[in-house]
Amino acid sequence: MAINQIERAYRTWPILTECAARSSTISYGELGDAIGVHHRAIRFILHHIQNYCIEANLPPLTILIVNSSGLPGAGFIAHDLDDFQHGLDTVYGKNWSEEQNPFGFSQNGDSMDSLVTELVQEPSSSKEIYSRVKSRGIRQILFRDALIKAYSSRCAFTEISMLDSLEACHIIPWSQTKPEQRLDVRNGILLNRFHHALFDAARITITTNHRIVFRTRKKDKDISSIEHNLTVNLHGSKMHMPREEKLRPHPSYIEKHHELLGWEAPEVKV
């Protein structure tokens, strides 16, 4: 049976927040002993806690786990280690009692992988999963992971496959959605950062038959050839879509996006 690293993260979280309250660090071995796992397996747990802190814009809690050198291991990316003390100070200065353990959903037997699988296998399960996962940061990670799976790790507009550059873009903006829509992969597109920004700024969109529409402006005549290729040249082309039709952007979500962001009907006929 696969090990549920999220359940381990749930048990690790209070240990780290207690260390933060005491302004102390903890070694990999000490943490492993505290939760009953080998110290070499700690990195798999810290991956989830680190990602959560980054997504939720929290101080880098995993900076507290140090090796024999007194520094975090090679997998730590949440803070510049050239400024290690400042990273520690931000963690020590945070009142972690204000933060709910974000991994509580694991107590029902859920893992990140199992929830992502549910979202992709049955998109309508999104409302129920949203109610089980209380942390917005975890919800955002789940949504991105589900889109990565649905879109086979490729940007819908360019087919770029470098995961670090890919983001989860909501069709109906998060602030305008109902709970059942926030984790629905049919209300999302996997996009690179550049096109995600243009999509949210109403410079680029998709039609209900999944073609790309770019909104030109007079000042666009001064854009570079690279920008031209990534915008004007995409106009009218078919977006890269999930293989399974049930995972593709839903027309009702696309129409609502057009309404909210001011896209006129003639603009989205290509």
Model-derived features: where do they sit?
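A detector for short metal-coordination/catalytic motifs
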Residues: 138, 142, 160-166, 171-270
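Positively charged, aromatic-accented nucleic-acid-binding surfaces
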Residues: 1-25, 29-37, 61-124, 260, ...
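Residue-level detection of the helix-turn-helix DNA-binding "recognition helix"
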Residues: 36, 47, 160
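Short, charged surface segments at domain edges that flank catalytic/cofactor-binding sites
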Residues: 118-154, 172-185
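Short, hydrophobic/aromatic alpha-helical segments in well-folded domains
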Residues: 15, 27, 143, 154, ...
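Short, basic alpha-helical nucleic acid-contact segments in DNA-binding proteins
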Residues: 41-45, 49-61
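Amphipathic alpha-helical interaction segments
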Residues: 23, 38, 53-57, 199-202
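A structural signal for short, well-ordered beta-strand segments and their strand-loop junctions
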Residues: 25-27, 156-157, 167
